[in-house]
């Protein structure tokens, strides 16, 4: 059932819904401003007191997804304007090839997709994609979703069973859910195909040494000079 097909007209849950819209979303937004999560997108955060983290982007995406759910039931121009500003800051970091992760683009450009198990790149991509789907539903504006579709196309070019691609999968599952939602939203099979690949590829090797994360760790240790 779509969220716009449901209405809560009275009682406890109506009160909670109104509290979420008028208080909770803005309280979380204030926390994100204070901790530098939004400023980090443009590099204006304090690098010591507001040291960037690999999954700050996903925090913003989850906040906005909640806002977009609320906006699908009741328009909110103030909230839409705030989210629109954050979206612009996020997609301004998109690279020419479609890659979109401010942390790695700004701080570790040589480490993209080198530690899928621990570094949350695909996890962040998933939350951004989920948020973009709900943004499109709430506003009709496709700029966020268009940017995320470009990122998905980039991910498709990097991962898969085809020769030259990485046979990896996310350490923290999340993008699979987002890809299915994107497929349901657009009916574009590429989203479903990528989700299916990530799900089916996980845990397919009988020998521990054949698992992607084991091979990935070996490459990282070689890069850092821990092994020859």
Q: Which residues fall in each region the model found?
A:
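Glycan-recognition and catalytic cores of secretory/periplasmic carbohydrate-active enzymes
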Residues: 1-228
